[in-house]
A protein has these predicted regions:
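Glycine-rich hexapeptide-repeat left-handed beta-helix
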Residues: 1, 5-7, 29-53, 58-64, ...
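Conserved CoA-thioester-binding segment of acyl-CoA-metabolizing enzymes
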Residues: 12-14, 25, 31
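Long alpha-helical scaffolds
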Residues: 14-15, 160
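Short metal-binding segments enriched for Cys and/or His
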Residues: 90
Length: 185
């Protein structure tokens, strides 16, 4: 099967992992050619610090997770996230729990993704963005500087536009829009 058990995780033999700079939970699946702990892709800052990965995450083939840019920062991936193939999580990103990143998603540095968000195929998120909880981003969307992705809404396009409330996800999770608005305060 080409997978091996290591530190309570299932890791493909072709995965490249910087164990020295990684703190990882259990029951994660790390697929073929995944790179965790590559240098931060920043022209003026040195890679330093740690990557923190919780429990029960799936990293499909060719994903990249980069080191943070200083010891005071971290690249963080919570619990039960599903990261599809060829996704890039750049330096200093913070991903909460139950997030889905579809194939070929690219997160610039310092992106914060709140719980339950779903990003469609080939979504590109510019650095320093916040993606609200239980938001859904349509495939091929480009999120540039200074755009607030509000919790609980569906967004799509180039440039990105708010389409409507993500009612289905909110009903499934029994979450009111008012509760999500309070997250922004």
């Amino acid at each position: 099967m080409n997978y091996q058990k290591k530190k309570g995780n299932l890791i493909h033999k072709t995965a490249v992992i910087n164990w020295r700079n990684l703190k990882i939970g259990i029951n994660n699946k790390i697929g073929p050619y995944v790179v965790i702990g590559g240098e931060a892709q920043h022209p003026r800052k040195k890679s330093d610090g740690k990557i923190y990965i919780g429990d029960n995450n799936v990293f499909n083939e060719y994903c990249n997770v980069h080191l943070p840019t200083s010891r005071k920062k971290k690249t963080f991936i919570g619990n039960s996230n599903y990261i599809m193939n060829s996704t890039t999580i750049d330096h200093d990103c913070y991903i909460e729990d139950n997030v889905i990143l579809s194939s070929n998603v690219v997160l610039g540095g310092n992106v914060y993704i709140m719980k339950g968000a779903q990003l469609g195929i080939r979504t590109i998120v510019h650095q320093n963005q916040v993606i609200g909880s239980y938001s859904m981003i349509g495939m091929g969307t480009l999120i540039t500087k200074k755009k607030m992705i509000e919790p609980g809404y569906i967004f799509y396009g180039k440039p990105v536009k708010k389409i409507k409330s993500n009612n289905i996800a909110l009903k499934r999770k029994k979450i009111s829009e008012q509760k999500l608005k309070n997250e922004l305060i």
